[in-house]
Amino acid sequence: MYQDLIHNELNEAAETLANFLKDDANIHAIQRAAVLLADSFKAGGKVLSCGNGGSHCDAMHFAEELTGRYRENRPGYPAIAISDVSHISCVSNDFGYDYIFSRYVEAVGREGDVLLGISTSGNSGNVIKAIAAAREKGMKVITLTGKDGGKMAGTADIEIRVPHFGYADRIQEIHIKVIHILIQLIEKEMVK
């Protein structure tokens, strides 16, 4: 009944991944991002992650697997997803939704930390403000974006961009794979 739809969806996902893999810069960016994060942890830093909607869930997933575990037991790594509901509702009410991430970065970010900003469009105003706040703090910035990178293009130390201009879910599918690879590489770097 739905076999054609299922095949089409999986083929489109495979095509998106194949297009991402065609650009060696993506592979190098993932490696550089993992080393940057591990170096921050080794120096006593932490990572703050943020995004909206599905990207918010990806930011939480990233932090959870760093503080908890990925595939193997190991010490937890210092990662915080900016996802505290009381913080988000307070800042949204008192300052506006565009400031929910930047206020948190201003409060707990410090030089040597890393911000991971996730946006499939690259145009999330609150993530862009978080990047600016991270820069003010002397933090490094990694972004996971899609399409042409949007307004976030060129704002990060390392941008990992999925060049897909269709639905956001295709971009998110690559983002979660990148997140898992980052964690795997961080684990390898941390035991060097």
Curated annotation (Swiss-Prot):
Pathway noted in the entry: Carbohydrate biosynthesis; D-glycero-D-manno-heptose 7-phosphate biosynthesis; D-glycero-alpha-D-manno-heptose 7-phosphate and D-glycero-beta-D-manno-heptose 7-phosphate from sedoheptulose 7-phosphate: step 1/1
Keywords: Carbohydrate metabolism, Cytoplasm, Isomerase, Metal-binding, Zinc
Binding locations of substrate: 52-54, 65, 93-94, 119-121, 124, 172
Annotated GO MF terms: carbohydrate derivative binding; D-sedoheptulose 7-phosphate isomerase activity; zinc ion binding
Protein's GO biological process: carbohydrate metabolic process; D-glycero-D-manno-heptose 7-phosphate biosynthetic process
Lineage top rank: taxon: Bacteria
Cofactors that this protein relies on: Zn(2+)
Catalytic activity: 2 D-sedoheptulose 7-phosphate = D-glycero-alpha-D-manno-heptose 7-phosphate + D-glycero-beta-D-manno-heptose 7-phosphate
E.C. no: 5.3.1.28
GO cellular component: cytoplasm
Domain called SIS: residue spans: 37-192
Location relative to the cell: Cytoplasm
Cofactor note: Binds 1 zinc ion per subunit.
Description of how the protein assembles with itself and partners: Homotetramer.
Sequence similarity: Belongs to the SIS family. GmhA subfamily.
Other known facts: The reaction produces a racemic mixture of D-glycero-alpha-D-manno-heptose 7-phosphate and D-glycero-beta-D-manno-heptose 7-phosphate.
General function of this protein: Catalyzes the isomerization of sedoheptulose 7-phosphate in D-glycero-D-manno-heptose 7-phosphate.
Name this protein carries in UniProt: Phosphoheptose isomerase
Organism: Salmonella dublin (strain CT_02021853)
High-level lineage: Bacteria, Pseudomonadati, Pseudomonadota, Gammaproteobacteria, Enterobacterales
